[in-house]
């Protein structure tokens, strides 16, 4: 993993810790800065601090960090992400107020913001999800593959014992696990449906390449809907479910 991605992943853990316990979060961010900011400051660290401040309604401090992150980000893409967040917080708006969820690109960035807010999700799941969303405009099929991975990783994190039982019995498949969770009434029919939709879309994105010649890459990319709001909404349904389930059942993540 590149240093930049390692910083991003670790900053999400520190973000979660601060959101839930500022003392632990301050310590985690201090350690992260000691490790990576000896020569220069890093935009992703300060963006994650800003999100943690915003989660705890410390909006002036959040805005200051978002502005610093924008200055520190080395590429236009991330500067635009920071500016969008600056605009939203400056107007004292939540993601629900700011984004038009009927517009696919807005829905992408709404989802991005919600992942930062869903601090009861597994840290690595949040990282993979944010990474997939950040490149979704140009690599949507790969994002679908990542969303399937997000689903599987979070199921393994939240329902570890059930997954281990299926692995031990050599009967593991994501479809089997989803059906088992529904049979045990751990998830509703609607959640199970959303999970199966993401599972199948990820499978399709993985295997559809086989339908095209090696030199026919453009046709592969073009074979996917560029305005796939349905799958984004399925993903949001799943992420919200797990965030709420983990919070309500006091499922602990490592400090």
Model-based region annotation:
Residues 189-255:
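Charge-enriched, short contiguous segments at helix-coil
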Residues 15-16, 44, 51-54, 84, ...:
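Residue-level recognition of tetratricopeptide repeat
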Residues 20-22, 56, 93, 137:
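Structural motif corresponding to the intra-repeat A-B loop/turn of tetratricopeptide repeats
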Residues 17-31:
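Helix-turn-helix repeat elements of alpha-solenoid scaffolds
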Residues 159-196, 200:
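Short, charged amphipathic alpha-helical segments flanked by flexible coils
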Residues 75, 80-141, 244:
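Charged alpha-helical initiation segments
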Residues 8, 44, 78-81:
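Start-of-helix register in tetratricopeptide repeats
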Residues 25-28, 62, 143:
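Single-residue signature of alpha-solenoid repeat helices
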């Amino acid at each position: 993993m590149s240093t930049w991605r390692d910083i991003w992943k670790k900053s999400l853990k520190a973000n979660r810790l601060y959101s839930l316990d500022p003392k632990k979060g301050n310590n985690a961010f201090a350690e992260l800065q000691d490790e990576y900011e000896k020569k220069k400051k890093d935009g992703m660290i300060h963006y994650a601090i800003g999100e943690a401040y915003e989660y705890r309604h410390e909006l002036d401090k959040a805005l200051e960090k978002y502005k610093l992150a924008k200055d520190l980000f080395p590429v236009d893409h991330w500067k635009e992400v920071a500016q969008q967040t600056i605009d939203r917080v400056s107007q004292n708006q939540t993601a629900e107020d700011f984004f038009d969820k009927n517009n696919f690109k807005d829905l992408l960035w709404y989802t991005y913001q919600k992942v930062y807010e869903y601090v009861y999700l597994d840290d690595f799941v949040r990282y993979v999800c944010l990474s997939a969303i950040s490149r979704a405009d140009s690599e949507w099929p790969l994002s679908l593959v990542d969303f399937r991975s997000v689903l599987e990783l979070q199921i393994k994190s939240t329902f570890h014992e059930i997954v281990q039982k299926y692995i031990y019995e050599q009967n593991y498949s994501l479809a089997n696990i989803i059906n088992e969770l529904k049979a045990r009434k751990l998830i509703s029919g609607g959640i199970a449906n959303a999970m199966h939709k993401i599972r199948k879309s990820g499978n399709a994105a993985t295997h559809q390449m086989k339908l095209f010649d090696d030199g026919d890459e453009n046709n592969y990319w073009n074979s996917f809907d560029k305005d796939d709001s349905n799958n984004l909404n399925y993903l949001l349904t799943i992420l919200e479910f797990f965030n709420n389930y983990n919070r309500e059942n006091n499922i602990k993540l490592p400090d």
